[in-house]
Curated annotation (Swiss-Prot):
Its EC number is 2.7.1.130. The keyword ATP-binding applies. Pathway: Glycolipid biosynthesis; lipid IV(A) biosynthesis; lipid IV(A) from (3R)-3-hydroxytetradecanoyl-[acyl-carrier-protein] and UDP-N-acetyl-alpha-D-glucosamine: step 6/6. This is Tetraacyldisaccharide 4'-kinase. It comes from the Bacteria. One of its GO terms (molecular function) is tetraacyldisaccharide 4'-kinase activity. GO terms for biological process: lipid A biosynthetic process; lipopolysaccharide core region biosynthetic process. HAMAP family: LpxK (MF_00409). Signal peptide: none annotated. The gene is lpxK. Disulfide bonds: none annotated.
């Protein structure tokens, strides 16, 4: 999967998109066939997948965290499953936020592990087995909707209302990961994030396909006011502009804005440039929680930058505060129905304790 989304993906299709359409057609055929016909392994506990239609960030990780908190409030032990994108470890691993660094396990798994049991695995089936062995009674997949490796009981697709589907084309002509109709058939529900109208078309398509949708927004955690402050804001996420808007919404004046690639680890020169610029212009340094965890645990200038950063943390807040609990309940029911079908067909789930029924 392409890790960086070219800017033209998020604008009206131009000659670059049209030039790549033949490749997109082939990619879409393969991705759609895999989603429709992939042999999915089954686990004995409910699986919720938080995914999206497109490459890049839409708010999957904050959504997964919100669902995990709702699960814990219901007395469940949720476990996150991630591929560990951006990390170097290629073995199935239980993430320890006090021991591991982002360079090894990825930035998002470190954030998830602060909330609940988290396993990274290049093979999602192996990761799911490990979560069951570790005592999880609910799996929350952060991404992986299109992978067709694991049986999913509830697929929640997150879509950014300000970006939507971009130019609407499939990779590499655009940001869409697989044919939209196939993705909708495999989805359980949509989550529209933010107040824009770029997602209205896909929401209407979902409604015609009898798929429910929820609405939510990203809210800054705590009283993190920046009123009247001049700041240097840096972000290495899929949509840095969204972070910069969030900073400005807190009353800050962004004097310097620096964007880096999603999941990118800063070089010593880049860190030095941020520190020097902020000191020379007397600026407060602000960044995202993902960028902060990539700095944490490193010596030298990375530690200096981490110490000087103001971290702007955000939470995914559902308009209907009961929605996360409802999603969990629906996943549990779907898991029970899946297991009954498998029992009748003589299919055995992977070993592990039975999920909540």
């Amino acid at each position: 999967m392409i890790s960086e989304a070219p800017p033209f993906w998020w604008r009206k299709a131009d000659w670059r998109a049209w030039l790549l359409l033949p490749v997109s057609f082939l990619y879409g055929r393969i991705a759609g066939h895999r989603m429709a016909h992939g042999r999915r392994a089954s686990v004995a506990i409910p699986v919720i997948c938080v995914g999206n239609f497109t490459v890049g960030g839409a708010g999957k990780t904050p959504t997964a965290l919100t669902i995990a908190r709702a699960a814990k409030a219901k007395g469940l032990k949720p476990g996150f499953l991630s591929r560990g994108y951006g990390g170097s470890l290629d073995v199935t691993t239980v993430v320890d936020p006090d021991h591991h660094r982002a360079v090894a396990v990825g930035d998002e798994p470190l954030l998830l592990a602060r909330e609940a049991l988290t396993v990274i695995s290049r093979r999602r089936v192996d990761g799911a087995q490990r979560l069951v062995a570790e005592g999880a009674d609910l799996i929350i997949m952060d991404d992986g909707f299109q992978s067709a490796r694991l049986a999913i009981d509830y697929a929640l697709l997150v879509i950014d209302a300000t970006r939507g589907l971009g130019n609407g084309h499939i990779v590499p002509a655009g940001p869409v990961r697989a044919p939209i109709r196939q993705q909708l058939r495999s989805a359980t529900a949509l989550l529209k994030v933010g107040g824009g109208n770029a997602a209205d078309r896909i929401v209407r398509m979902a409604a015609r396909a009898a798929k429910p949708y929820f609405t939510a927004s990203l809210k800054v955690r705590g009283d993190n006011t920046l009123a009247g402050m001049k700041v240097l804001a840096f972000a290495g996420i899929a949509d840095p502009a969204k972070f910069f808007r969030t900073v400005e919404s807190r009353g800050a004046e962004i004097t310097v804005a620096k964007s880096f690639g999603d999941h990118e680890h800063l070089t010593e020169d880049e860190i030095d440039d941020i520190l020097t610029t902020a000191e020379r212009q007397d600026l407060l340094i602000v960044t995202t929680s993902k960028d902060f965890v990539r700095l944490s645990g490193h010596p030298g200038k990375a530690a200096q930058l981490a110490e000087k950063c103001r971290v702007i943390e955000v939470d995914m807040v559902f308009e209907d505060h009961l929605a996360p609990s409802l999603i969990i309940d629906r996943a549990i029911v779907a898991c029970r129905e899946r297991r009954l079908r498998e029992m009748k067909a003589g299919i055995k789930a992977m070993p592990g304790k039975a999920g909540p029924l």
